[in-house]
A protein has these predicted regions:
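A surface-exposed, charged beta-strand/loop segment in the N-terminal or early-internal portion
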Residues: 1-117
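Short flexible/disordered coil segments
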Residues: 71, 126-128
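Short, solvent-exposed helix-loop connector elements
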Residues: 83, 125-126
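Residues that form generic nucleotide/phosphate-binding pockets
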Residues: 101, 122-125
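Charged mid-protein connector segments
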Residues: 119-123, 131
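Conserved small/polar residues in nucleotide/adenosyl-binding loops
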Residues: 129-135
Length: 135
């Protein structure tokens, strides 16, 4: 049965030559892990590495498996796009710190819609709507 939910990507780990394992915190299911095959290959695939960067807010479609098993993504779509995150060293460092912090804090977190919404709103405010302190 296909499920669709919004999620914040916490991290992704290289799994093989062409695959990654992605961990995210979802609005409806809590912590989820997926294996994404072919995302690192030279051939064109429906998933790109840019769409699975840490702290990306995405909408994912997947088949729900038993707890503890890695699911396969059917589709992923960006909800919030951080335009300057790659090019702004200050925001990039903040994002890396927050991704690592959230990954450790939310390690066993179950579904909690209000916590998800708070984290999402905080990330959008911090990474999207703040200007450089160096300017």
């Amino acid at each position: 049965m296909a499920s669709v939910t919004e999620a914040i990507i916490l991290n992704s780990i290289k799994y093989s030559e062409t695959s990654v394992i992605m961990k995210c915190y979802s609005q409806n299911y809590g912590i989820l892990s997926f294996i994404i095959k072919g995302v690192r290959s030279r051939k064109r695939t429906k998933f790109s590495l840019g769409s699975i960067e840490p702290l990306s807010i995405v909408e994912i479609e997947f088949n729900r498996l038993k707890k503890g098993e890695l699911s396969h993504l059917k589709n992923i779509k960006s909800v919030v796009i951080y335009d300057d995150l790659r090019f702004n060293i200050i925001k990039s460092n903040i994002a890396l710190f927050l991704a690592e912090f959230l990954s450790n804090v939310l390690r066993f977190q179950e579904e909690n819609t209000s916590l998800y919404q708070y984290i999402k709103d905080s990330l959008v405010t911090c990474l999207l709507y703040t200007s450089d302190a160096a300017d």
